[in-house]
Amino acid sequence: MNKTKIYINGKLIGTCDNPEEFVEEIRAKRRSGEVSHEMNITHYPENHEIYIFTDPGRARRPLIIVEDGEPLLKEEHLEKLSSGEMEWDDLISQGIIEYLDAEEEENTYIAMSPEEVTEEHTHLEIDPSTMLGICAGIIPFANHNSSPRNTMEAGMTKQALGLYASNYNLRTDTRAHLLHHPQVPIVKTRIIDVTGYDERPSGQNFVVAVMSYEGYNMEDALILNKASLERGLARSSFFRSYEATERRYPGGQEDRFEIPEKGVRGYRSERDYRHLDEDGIINPETEVSSGDVLIGKTSPPRFLEEIDEFGTVAERRRETSVTVRHGEEGIVDAVLLTETVEGSRLAKIRVREQRQPEFIGDKFASRHGQKGVVGLIVSQEDMPFTEDGVVPDLIVNPHAIPSRMSVGQVLEMLAGKAACMEGRRVDGTPFTGEEEKDLKEALKANGFESAGVETLYNGITGERIEAEIFIGVAYYQKLHHMTTDRIYARSRGPVQVLTRQPTEGRAREGGLRFGEMERDCLIAHGAALALKERLLDESDKYEALVCAECGMIAIYDKIRDKKYCPICEDSESFPVEISYAFKLLLDELKSLCIFPKLVLEDKA
C-alpha cells in the first residue's frame, strides 16, 4: 500500500497510512474550533497526496455543511440571526457554515437548493448566486448566458464609466473618466443590493431595438439616436492632471516657475504662453488646446557654459514648460499649488474635457458581454418608431444574439420593458430571479405582445416594417475606449536621433508603421516607386558618399569643401542614396571589426 504524502502550503512534511480518516479528523477539528477555520485540506486519492493550505490571500467562499442528507442550518438559526441573538461568526464557530477554497471544493458535492439535497451531498449553497464574484454578480439572468460572455462582461464592468470616487473634485488623478448621468439599473440582482452598486452605478438604461439598419450595424456596430445623445445620454468628462516641481540642483541652482523670456534656449512662441499669469501658471476655466503651455518653467543649463570676456560664467537657462498633450484639449478645471516633502514648490493642473459620442468608434457594452462600437449616429426623425411613438436610443444587430447564446440580454430587455410599464424594478438574480412567464404576463397585462415584439415604422419613408421587431430596455455601459483617444494621423513630424526614422506612437507624434505585410502588398502589385517612396523617401533617405576604390563610406569636410575617403584619402567618391538604417548597420559592423565593402556600378 502506498503511503499518502502530506503537504502544507506546498511543502512536504510527512506521510500517513489512512488518508480518508486523517482528512475527516482534521475537518471535524476545524468545525469544532480546535483548528483554525482559515485552514483548508484537500485529498487527491489518485496521486496519493493530501494538501493543507493556510496561505493568506486565497479566494474562499462560505457554504452550508450537509450531514446525512440534512443541511445543518435550520429555521431556528435564521430566526436567531434575524432577532440578533446570533451573528455570522457564530455559524462558523458552531460548524454550521464553513469557508472552502478552490482546492477543497474538489472534494465536495454541492447542492444548489435545499430541495436537491441527497445523502451524497456534502454542502449546500447559501444562495446559488454566491458562487459568482462582484463583477459577475451584477449580470442579470447570468445563468442564461454562455460562460465566455459572462467572463467577458466581468472584465468589461471594470472599464465602464461611472462615478469612480465621490471626492473626484478634490483629487488630481493622472487620468479619470466621469459619467454625467449614471442611472441605477432597472433590472437588478441581489448582489447589486448587497454591494451598494446603486450608490455609484456605471451605466444607463437604453431603449434598445434588435434589428438591422442599412448595414451600418454589421459586426457588432451600434446605431445611436442623435437626439438622445444631445439630451445627455452617454455624456462624460475626461480629466487629465499635469504637474511640475521647482527642483533644486547641487550648486544652488533651481528651476523657476515663470513666463520664459525670449533669450531662453528652447523658447516657444508668444502664442503658446498667452494663457499664463504673471507667476507662470495658468488660471482656472481657461480653454486650452494641444501644445498650449500650462506651467511656464525654466531650468538651469545641464552643463556649465563657457566663460565670457569678463571671466564670469554666463548662465543661459533652458525652457522646460509643461504643455497640453498632443491631440488633447479642454478647460483648466483646477490649479493646485503646494510643496513637496523637500520644500520645493509643486504645481498641479487638472484639465477637463467633455466627451459626447460625436464620432463613430466609441465602445459600449451591455451586461452580457455584447460589446460593440458606434457605427452610425442617426437623427431622431430618421430612426424607426413604434405605434406609440417610442424611438429607440440604440439599435443592435440581431446576429449578435443566437450564436453567442446570450439569452440573458433578451430576458433583461423583456424584464426592463415590464418594469417600465409597472413602475418597479425587476429582480434578475441568477437562478432565483423572477420567472420568464411572470414577465410575459406583465407585458400582456399592459397591452404588449408577451414576446416583447412590436410593429415599427421606418422613420425615413413612414412605411410599416414588415418584420416584428424585438424592443425593450437594457442597461448599457460606456467603456473608456473612445475614438478621441485613439484617432491619429501624421503628415510631418519628429524623427529618432539614432535611426533618423519617424518616432513611434501617438503620444510622440509618431509615424504610422508601414510593416512587412503592407510592403508585401505593394510588391504583389508591382508598385516599385510607391514602395521606394514609403520605405526610403518618406522614412530615412540618406545620401552617402562612397569611395570608388575601397567601397568605404567617404567623408565630406564642410570647412575645406572637400570629399575624401578615410582609407584611400584622395580617391574619387560618388553620392549614393541609401536608407540611414543601412548606414547605421555598416557603422555597427565596423565597430565589430568587420569591413563592409560597397561595390559601385554605373546606373543602368
From Swiss-Prot:
**Gene Ontology CC:** cytoplasm; DNA-directed RNA polymerase complex
Where, per UniProt, does this protein localize?
A: Cytoplasm
The Gene Ontology biological process annotation of the record reads: DNA-templated transcription
Q: What is its EC number?
A: 2.7.7.6
Broad class of the protein's primary localization? cytoplasm
Necessary cofactors = Zn(2+)
Q: Name one Pfam family in it.
A: RNA_pol_Rpb2_4
InterPro entries, A to Z: DNA-dir_RNA_pol_su2 (IPR015712), DNA-dir_RNAP_su2_dom (IPR007120), DNA-dir_RNAP_su2_hyb_sf (IPR037033), RNA_pol_bsu_CS (IPR007121), RNA_pol_Rpb2_4 (IPR007646), RNA_pol_Rpb2_5 (IPR007647), RNA_pol_Rpb2_7 (IPR007641), RNA_pol_RPB2_OB-fold (IPR014724)
Q: Which Gene Ontology MF annotations are present?
A: DNA binding; DNA-directed RNA polymerase activity; ribonucleoside binding; zinc ion binding
**What does the record's cofactor remark say about binding?**
Binds 1 Zn(2+) per subunit.
- Annotated positions binding Zn(2+): C547, C550, C565, C568
Q: Which UniProt keywords apply?
A: Cytoplasm, DNA-binding, DNA-directed RNA polymerase, Metal-binding, Nucleotidyltransferase, Transcription, Transferase, Zinc
The UniProt catalytic activity note for this protein reads:
RNA(n) + a ribonucleoside 5'-triphosphate = RNA(n+1) + diphosphate
Q: Which residues are annotated as active site?
A: K348, H481
Transit peptide: present as a keyword of the record? Answer: no
- SUPFAM superfamilies annotated for this entry? beta and beta-prime subunits of DNA dependent RNA-polymerase (SSF64484)
Q: Relate the protein's function as given in its record.
A: DNA-dependent RNA polymerase (RNAP) catalyzes the transcription of DNA into RNA using the four ribonucleoside triphosphates as substrates. The Rpo2 subunit (Rpo2N and Rpo2C in this organism) is implicated in DNA promoter recognition and in nucleotide binding.
Assembly with partners or alone:
Part of the RNA polymerase complex.
Protein family = Belongs to the RNA polymerase beta chain family.
Q: What is this protein called?
A: DNA-directed RNA polymerase subunit Rpo2C
